[in-house]
Amino acid sequence: MVVAGMTLTTGLSALQGDPVEAEEALPLPARDGRVVLYVMDQPDLGLTDDMAPHIDQINYAFALLEGGEADGSHWQGIRQLEGYLARHGHIDGVLSVGGWGAEGFSDACATAEGRKRLADSILRLMDRYGFTGVDIDWEYPGSSAAGIKSREEDVDNWYALLALLRQGLDQRQTERGRDYLLSVALGAGAEQLAMVDGERLGGLVDQAVVMAYDLQGFDRITGHHAGLYPAGDTPNSGAFAVNALTDSGLFAGKILLGIPAYGRVWRQVSGDNDGLHQRAATAGNRTLRYDELQQLESQGYTRHDDEEAQATWWLGCGNFVSGEDEASLTAKADWLRENGLLGAAVWAQHQDPGGALLMTLSGALAPSPVADGD
């Protein structure tokens, strides 16, 4: 990491002996919550210096599992990340492992020897590239979602893996005198939430990212894919997921509300009820980036608010589009502040080129001004 006014070597630069010049610290806006940004590995990460004050933590996605160990040999943008973190020393760099459809967790964690091998490899990869934390994104223990292998013992093995990582991170903290964090990504559906013992999980992790998106979109009935509150006949929502976790004993101050930087599109939708909860010709499989959502009204779409769900949608050209805008982001920022959450986690940078959603969210988390006399 970088301290203003000092020249440090870290991660790849340290390995290759190239010094990194630290810049003067940028002014950081005050926020009532932590902003975590998932950055997917690709040749151009799309990170600009003007985004940096709005980011507290980058989760670099993803290390994959090969032969029972964490592997980053496929990474193309790691040098860019190194440089970015070196220039902006206030940002924590966290290694995310797994992701949707990532195979190998169940087999690797099936035995004590396998779990130790995997945990040790994750920590080695973290150390090699100068990350200061680990985010485990196993989607999902005990489930064959996306066709991955699973077994009945996965949930217990997941906790056991987290315990080994916690032990290794704590040991590094003692030896090196700095904090190392452990995070998990959690599904927001009832089936995924049922596997979580919040009290047990809270004793192991510093952060839990609730992936409160893709809640709808896999059938032909339109709806909010990332609504804050339930709507229609489905309970799935960000608030539902967070409340389920806190009810199970997870401290709200460890929870990050997941926010999508993309919308979902259903095609050939009737105008009844302004398109909401209507049958479409397609499922909501097509996605639009945040900057594309911002252009919809100029293309003839009409924007609508669902006050019950605190969600936004657009209807136009026969299409129904569910996604975020300033109003829905502000509602989520207000809610997570009022409920004592740690903050928000945005998936993902490549869907928010230029950082408009990131900056809007950061602004929405700014402390409310104190009125005279308060």
Give a label for each model feature:
Residues 57-63, 96, 137-139, 207-216:
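Non-cysteine beta-strand/loop elements that form the S-adenosyl-L-methionine
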Residues 97, 259-335, 361-374:
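Glycan-binding loop/region signatures in secreted carbohydrate-active enzymes
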Residues 31-33, 56, 89-93, 130-132, ...:
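Short, well-ordered coil/turn segments that N-cap beta-strands
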Residues 36, 67-76, 120, 141-293:
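Substrate-binding surface in catalytic domains of secreted glycosidases
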Residues 58, 95, 136, 165, ...:
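Conserved, mostly hydrophobic/aromatic
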Residues 145, 149-158, 305-306, 353-374:
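Short acidic, glycine/proline-enriched helix-loop-strand junctions
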Residues 60, 131, 136, 184, ...:
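Conserved beta-strand positions
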Residues 21-127, 143, 153, 164, ...:
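Glycan-recognition patch characteristic of GH18 chitinases/ENGases
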